[in-house]
C-alpha cells in the first residue's frame, strides 16, 4: 500500500478549506473582509490568496479572516509568516528568543504532549 503524503498546510489552503467548510463562497467571504480604506477586498484578490499567489497585505486582513472564519489569529499569523503584534512588541534579547523558539519547535515535534 502506498503512503499518502499530506498536502502542505499553507495560509491560502487553510483559508480556502475553512471557507468551504463554513459554506461560504469566495464572493461572500470577500464582502466581509475590508481593506484599510473600508472597501471590501475583491473576489480575485481572495482567489489569489487561496491559491498562494498573493499574501495578505496587512495585519488587519489576517485578523478579519480569522474572525470571519472562526480561526485562531495566531495560527493564521504563523501560516502567513508573521508574528502577532503583541509578540513583536515584547521581542526578547537574542538568547531568550533562541530558547523560546527552540521550545516552540520541540512542542510542534512532540505534538504538544509535554
Placement of each model-derived feature along the sequence:
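A short, Lys/Arg-rich alpha-helix, primarily the initiator
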Residues: 1-23, 31, 102
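Short alpha-helical DNA-recognition segment
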Residues: 23-48
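DNA major-groove recognition helix of helix-turn-helix
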Residues: 33, 50, 61, 80
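The DNA-recognition helices of helix-turn-helix-type DNA-binding domains
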Residues: 36-37, 53, 80-84
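Short, basic-rich loop-to-helix N-cap that marks the start of a DNA-contacting helix
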Residues: 40, 51-67
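Short, solvent-exposed amphipathic helices
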Residues: 64, 75-78
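Interfacial/linker helices and their anchor residues that mediate assembly or domain coupling
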Residues: 80-114
Amino acid at each position: 500500500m502506498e503512503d499518502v503524503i499530506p498536502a502542505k498546510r499553507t495560509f491560502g489552503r487553510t483559508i480556502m478549506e475553512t471557507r468551504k467548510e463554513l459554506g461560504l463562497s469566495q464572493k461572500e467571504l470577500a464582502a466581509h473582509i475590508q481593506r484599510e480604506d473600508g472597501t471590501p477586498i475583491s473576489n480575485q484578490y481572495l482567489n489569489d490568496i487561496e491559491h498562494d499567489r498573493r499574501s495578505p497585505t496587512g495585519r488587519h486582513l489576517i485578523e478579519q479572516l480569522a474572525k470571519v472564519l472562526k480561526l485562531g489569529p495566531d495560527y493564521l499569523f504563523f501560516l502567513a509568516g508573521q508574528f502577532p503584534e503583541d509578540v513583536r512588541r515584547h521581542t526578547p534579547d537574542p538568547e531568550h528568543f533562541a530558547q523560546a523558539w527552540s521550545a516552540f519547535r520541540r512542542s510542534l515535534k512532540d505534538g504538544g504532549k509535554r
